[in-house]
Amino acid sequence: MDDFISISLLSLAMLVGCYVAGIIPLAVNFSEERLKLVTVLGAGLLCGTALAVIVPEGVHALYEDILEGKHHQASETHNVIASDKAAEKSVVHEHEHSHDHTQLHAYIGVSLVLGFVFMLLVDQIGNSHVHSTDDPEAARSSNSKITTTLGLVVHAAADGVALGAAASTSQTSVQLIVFVAIMLHKAPAAFGLVSFLMHAGLERNRIRKHLLVFALAAPVMSMVTYLGLSKSSKEALSEVNATGVAMLFSAGTFLYVATVHVLPEVGGIGHSHKPDATGGRGLSRLEVAALVLGCLIPLILSVGHQH
């Protein structure tokens, strides 16, 4: 019951924090130039968050269980076995250790690639409905907005699964670490999403709806995961390090959205095929500085979180 109360409070805090962070660009009236600058900053936040926060946290969650398990196993072995068996046991232990590490390396790559490929397929399915329209440029732009929101919602849902799986372990420290990691990138992601949608010309009411769906995805999925897991499922999940796998899958979706949609849209790359179009001029020095700053902010926050 205590776990249920804690997961409920964490979910509520996640919803409110994410929505408030996303409302900031809507609450302030920006000029055209300022809006572009904020959008570029938001794009930097998305990229920096994917690379500096989500991937390391996912890898950490994946390895933490194994390292803790090895620590307990080693101490038990030390207490139980006789000294003449110690050398033999340590050889077996070393072999198991390297085997586990090989498995974990595979988990990291597979989870990231699956997340990226999943979003790629979603994007292509969306694009297949676009080619039949009269104005492919406008249709592609509209599709880009939907895919960006969908990608971030899928990512947030995977975050929710990670938090729900963490809550099911009944370890408060694990729950808090996963919660802080999620909040560190959900707030910048909400800001980045809203500024991108504003730049893309979506009406404010629709932006609020997109933001609400994004803000709800993680809390709802964390509750569903927590309530839907039976005791045997929880044990199976802890065996395969579900928290780490879910976070790395969501990192793959996040990377796709940040690099394939948001950055090209902001830089005007690939959306205009005419040589004289203004969209292909690239970024000004100030915009590049904002992009770099956006990439560095999550890195600084994550370094502060680790210490």
Swiss-Prot record:
Record GO terms (molecular function):
androgen binding; G protein-coupled receptor activity; zinc efflux transmembrane transporter activity; zinc ion transmembrane transporter activity
Show the stretches that span the lipid bilayer: 4-24, 35-55, 106-126, 146-166, 176-196, 210-230, 244-264, 286-306
Q: Cellular component terms, GO, for this chain's entry?
A: mitochondrial membrane; mitochondrion; nucleus; perinuclear region of cytoplasm; plasma membrane; trans-Golgi network
Q: Which UniProt keywords apply?
A: Cell membrane, Cytoplasm, Glycoprotein, Golgi apparatus, Ion transport, Membrane, Mitochondrion, Nucleus, Transmembrane, Transmembrane helix, Transport, Zinc, Zinc transport
Q: In which tissues is it expressed?
A: Highly expressed in pancreas, testis, and pituitary and moderately in the kidney, liver, uterus, heart, prostate, and brain, whereas expression is lower in the ovary and colon.
Membrane-topology descriptor: Multi-pass membrane protein
Among the record's GO biological process terms, what is one? regulation of cellular response to testosterone stimulus
Q: Quick check: keyword Ribosomal protein in the entry?
A: no
Which sites does the entry annotate for glycosylation?
N29, N241
Reaction catalysed by this enzyme: Zn(2+)(in) = Zn(2+)(out)
Please give the chief subcellular localization of this protein.
Answer: Golgi
- Tell me what induces its expression: Up-regulated by testosterone in cancer cells.
Where does this one sit in the cell?
Golgi apparatus, trans-Golgi network membrane; Cell membrane; Cytoplasm, Perinuclear region; Mitochondrion
What this chain does, per the record?
Transports zinc ions across cell and organelle membranes into the cytoplasm and regulates intracellular zinc homeostasis. Participates in the zinc ions efflux out of the secretory compartments. Regulates intracellular zinc level, resulting in the enhancement of AKT1 and MAPK3/MAPK1 (Erk1/2) phosphorylation in response to the BCR activation. Also functions as a membrane androgen receptor that mediates, through a G protein, the non-classical androgen signaling pathway, characterized by the activation of MAPK3/MAPK1 (Erk1/2) and transcription factors CREB1 or ATF1.
Name the family: Belongs to the ZIP transporter (TC 2.A.5) family.
> What is the protein name given in its UniProt record?
Zinc transporter ZIP9
